[in-house]
């Protein structure tokens, strides 16, 4: 049996074992992509010098960050303080904005962008000059809640076309255990004509960015690193160690690092699902959930989770990557999927509860005007991806309610394109039957309960507060009908 049959990916080879391709490099066909493969294959034949930390520190070699969103851009800025960095994104508009000093994610200031020294580009050819490539692209789910690896596969193809021998490719995107070696490595090998473990190496270091969090920033969160071999793990330990003051944790394998990332958010998802279920139970018992949690929280080992919508590109998505892999190997996960069902249904539950309150107050439902404050997936960020507020909007619309949505941070064009929602100005919201504070942006905290309630028409104001930002006693003293999760 051939060695290649025993080891489908050279990344799995025992240390020191080298695979030799008996086929000579293809002739020059005039196809630029094919010529790239030929050139890189010939470099491999000559023997590759693997990228070293000192090469990067002395700026003899460059680092590329592929994908300049909420994860990639802050990472690129931190790395650029110590290394030469190329920032690549396939969206020309995104590159133009960054070059002009504007970050629409609000994660990096204009001053930090201007002083970063990052070479921003949407030209993939620029990757050819980089020997350490960090891939930080989204890994969403599709309409069937299965992993959508197309952004990751596309990035791997792009990197592979321009991969130089001796390089290292490290992935930060959240994936199911095994994806780096089973999905990404074969693409890199195919597109480059190189062999993983012989001509290049790979690593995995899961992102832990929390959008909008100015306390738990990239440099203050322990970084997990892993490599396809020991030198690669050492390289990533050194590179990330330059930018992460909190410390580095070296996982024993890439699969361990992948699994660690996917369970971080799965654990949070399940705990929030428990709080959401408790909230629905206590609501039927006319018990305030937050009062219960505050009382229970006096015990030293009670975990401080709160009920709420679970959206965004992490917590509401990552569990499906794990359940997908579990089912692929013949195991049907019960608890994880149960938690997902509860959290995915919370938008409809909130909308239905609001409708009941309208009826209870003797107000119409069909034709009622309700204001929804906040559309992004979390407070103080402009990110609309996978926001669960849209579930509330759609459920209310199904009851015939006219929903007026306001968000001070969301891009109106994105809201229109993604969800068909027309954002309203705050001044245009008045005389409504009820107000639902869905996302507690700073603007709404500043407004306070009284000003929010003043948006309602004559009669007793109705305010729904998903984050529990206000006090029921204060609402009662002002004659406000108030509800919170």
Where are these regions (language model features)?
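Short hydrophobic transmembrane-like helices used for membrane targeting/insertion
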Residues: 1-3, 18-20, 37-38
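Structural/interface elements that position substrates and couple domains in central-metabolism enzymes
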Residues: 46-485
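Short, Lys/Arg-enriched N-terminal segments with co-localized hydrophobic residues
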Residues: 31-49
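Extracellular glycan-interacting surfaces
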Residues: 26
């Amino acid at each position: 049996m051939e060695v290649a049959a025993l080891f489908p990916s050279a990344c799995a080879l025992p240390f020191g074992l080298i695979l030799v391709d008996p086929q000579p490099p293809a002739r020059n066909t005039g196809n630029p992509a094919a010529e790239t493969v030929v050139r890189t294959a010939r470099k491999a034949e000559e023997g590759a010098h693997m990228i070293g930390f000192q090469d990067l520190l002395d700026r003899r070699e460059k680092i590329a960050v592929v994908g300049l969103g909420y994860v990639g851009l802050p990472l690129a800025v931190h790395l650029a303080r110590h290394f030469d960095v190329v920032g690549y994104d396939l969206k020309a508009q995104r590159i133009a904005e960054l070059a002009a000093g504007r970050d629409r994610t609000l994660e990096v200031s204009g001053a930090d962008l201007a002083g970063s020294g990052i070479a921003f580009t949407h030209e993939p050819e620029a990757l050819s000059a980089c020997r350490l490539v960090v891939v930080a692209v989204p890994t969403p789910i599709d309409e069937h809640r299965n992993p959508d690896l197309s952004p990751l596969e596309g990035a791997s193809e792009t990197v592979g076309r321009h991969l130089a021998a001796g390089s290292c490719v490290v992935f930060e995107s959240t994936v199911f255990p095994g994806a780096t070696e089973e999905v990404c490595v074969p693409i890199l090998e195919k597109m480059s004509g190189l062999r993983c473990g012989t001509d290049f190496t790979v690593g995995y270091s899961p992102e832990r960015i929390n959008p909008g969090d100015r306390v738990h920033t990239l440099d203050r969160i322990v970084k997990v690193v892993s490599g396809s071999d020991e030198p690669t793990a050492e390289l990533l330990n050194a590179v990330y160690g330059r930018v992460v003051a909190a410390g580095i944790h070296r996982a024993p394998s890439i699969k361990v690092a992948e699994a660690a990332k996917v369970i971080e958010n799965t654990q949070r998802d399940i705990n929030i699902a428990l709080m959401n279920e408790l909230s629905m139970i206590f609501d039927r018992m006319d018990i305030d959930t937050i009062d219960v949690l505050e009382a229970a929280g006096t015990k030293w080992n009670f975990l401080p989770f709160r009920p709420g919508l679970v959206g965004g590109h992490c917590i509401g998505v990552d569990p499906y990557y794990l359940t997908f892999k579990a089912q692929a190997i013949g195991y049907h996960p019960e608890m994880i999927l149960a938690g997902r069902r509860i959290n995915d249904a919370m938008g409809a539950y909130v909308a239905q509860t609001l409708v009941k309150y309208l009826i209870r107050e003797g107000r119409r439902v069909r034709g009622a005007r309700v204001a929804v404050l906040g559309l992004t997936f979390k407070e103080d960020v402009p990110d609309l991806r996978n926001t669960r507020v849209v579930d509330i909007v759609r459920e209310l619309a199904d009851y015939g309610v006219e929903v007026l949505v306001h968000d001070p941070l969301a891009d109106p064009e994105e809201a229109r394109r993604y969800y068909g929602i027309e954002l309203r100005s705050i001044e245009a919201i008045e005389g409504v039957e009820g107000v639902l504070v869905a996302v507690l942006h700073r603007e709404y905290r500043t407004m306070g309960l009284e000003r929010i309630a003043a948006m309602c028409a004559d009669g007793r104001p109705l305010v729904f507060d998903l984050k529990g930002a206000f006090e029921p006693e204060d609402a009662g003293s002002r004659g406000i009908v108030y509800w919170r999760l």
